[in-house]
Curated annotation (Swiss-Prot):
Full protein name: 3-dehydroquinate synthase
One GO term of the biological process aspect: chorismate biosynthetic process
Annotated positions binding NAD(+): G115, V116, I117, G118, D119, T139, S140, K152, K161
Taxonomy of the source species: Bacteria, Pseudomonadati, Pseudomonadota, Alphaproteobacteria, Hyphomicrobiales
Coiled coil stretches, renumbered: none
Gene: aroB
Swiss-Prot/TrEMBL cofactor(s): Co(2+); Zn(2+); NAD(+)
Species per Swiss-Prot/TrEMBL record: Rhizobium johnstonii (strain DSM 114642 / LMG 32736 / 3841) (Rhizobium leguminosarum bv. viciae)
């Protein structure tokens, strides 16, 4: 965590990407001071805040007041909440509203919301006028530790999740930890899956720390800020090494190949499965598949499942309410995964806790056999 610095209760993680470098600020009260932080970086005259119908009543007024106090004029774009908002229809709406507001390249698009709003707003900012600057103000744990960092933006299509998008780095990320107090237990747990992921990728000591301290992370306070800062630093390190996902950055997709297929299988119905829950099940499946391929110990798979189950996350396909399509349909979704190259299946597998790696050309026959076994 060498790039994390402390200023009062605020942690700063720096993402050194040359001319596109930016800071992630983590701590309480950041929405109230957002205007001052943004004003010091703003080259234009105004901002457009993109949010959703769930977040707007909670935080939009406070953010706009902070912008007003800093002398920043703002427009507001409020979209429906939920994964289905990551669509062409709502992308077009957002772009049209930004153009109506006469947002220019040196102005700011501010994404106020969870991963859906961050992904869609960043995509809109990346294509309007061929690129408008933007700021992430993530309001869920999942978006604070994952989707708001790294510049990946996009929407879903009928062929799969996050298949259409651009790389567009933010100028600033403001992760106000106070907003996490408004999350439901289910939403917080779903975000925690992404926190645990960083330990499972290449930080076994962090995973062990989470096993010992997860209750304090859920309660709040310094342990929560520490977990978020460590997660952001872990992601920043990977992004700096491989910004465009040509190699190492694919490790961040641990659990996502299986997880995205399960999300598609539930038609992105959040009453059945949300993204972090899919990642939780997907990580257990990745460890179990690694054990099946004699790459990792079954004990590691059991350890991962035990911890995720302890915090209240689903760990099995059978934990998903309702019927799932057959294994062959799940396999079709996996074949559309963005990591597929030249038709070859690519998975993030593991040799143990904190020993994940990119596995190219995974035999489809092994995957389909494994899915049939787990589907039963």
């Amino acid at each position: 965590m060498n790039a994390i610095t402390s200023a009062s209760a605020i942690r700063t993680v720096h993402v050194p990407l040359g001319e596109r470098a930016y800071d992630i600020l983590i701590g309480p009260g950041l929405i109230a001071r957002a205007g001052a932080e943004i004003a010091s970086r703003l080259k234009g005259r105004k901002a457009a805040v993109v949010t959703d119908e769930n977040v707007a009543p909670l935080y939009l007024k406070a953010l706009v007041a902070s912008l007003d106090e800093a002398g920043i004029a703002s427009a507001e774009v409020v979209l429906p909440a939920g994964e289905k908002t990551k669509s062409f229809e709502h992308l077009i709406t957002a772009c049209d509203k930004l153009l109506e507001a006469r947002v220019e390249r040196n102005d700011y698009v501010i994404a106020l919301g969870g991963g859906v709003i961050g992904d869609l707003s960043g995509f809109a900012a990346g294509i309007v006028r061929r690129g408008v600057r933007f700021v992430q103000v993530p309001t869920s744990l999942l978006s604070q530790v994952d989707s708001s960092v790294g510049g990946k933006t996009g929407i879903n299509s009928r062929h799969g999740k996050n298949l259409i998008g651009v790389f567009h780095q933010p100028d600033l990320v403001l992760a106000d930890t106070d907003v996490l107090n408004s999350l439901s237990e289910r939403e917080f747990r779903a975000g925690y899956a992404e926190v645990a992921k960083y330990g499972l990728i290449d930080k076994p000591d962090f995973f062990a720390w989470l096993e010992a301290n997860w209750k304090s992370v859920f309660t709040g306070g310094s342990a929560r800020i520490e977990a978020i800062a460590a997660s952001c630093q872990a992601k920043a390190d990977v992004v700096v090494a491989d910004e465009r996902e040509n190699g190492q950055r694919a490790l961040l997709n641990l659990g996502h190949t299986f997880g995205h297929a399960l999300e598609a299988a539930t038609a992105y119905d959040s009453s059945r499965l949300v993204h972090g829950e899919g990642v939780s099940i997907g990580m257990v499946l990745a460890y179990e598949f690694s054990a099946r391929m004699n790459l990792a110990s079954p004990d590691d798979a059991r350890r991962v499942e035990r911890h995720l189950k302890e915090v209240g996350l689903p760990t099995r396909m059978s934990d998903i309410p309702g019927d799932l399509p057959p294994a062959e349909t799940l396999m079709d979704a996996i074949a559309q995964d963005k990591k597929v190259k030249s038709g070859k299946l690519t998975f993030i597998l593991t040799r143990g806790i904190g020993q994940s790696f990119v596995a190219d050309d995974v035999p489809a026959s092994e995957v389909i056999s494994f899915l049939r076994e787990k589907h039963a």
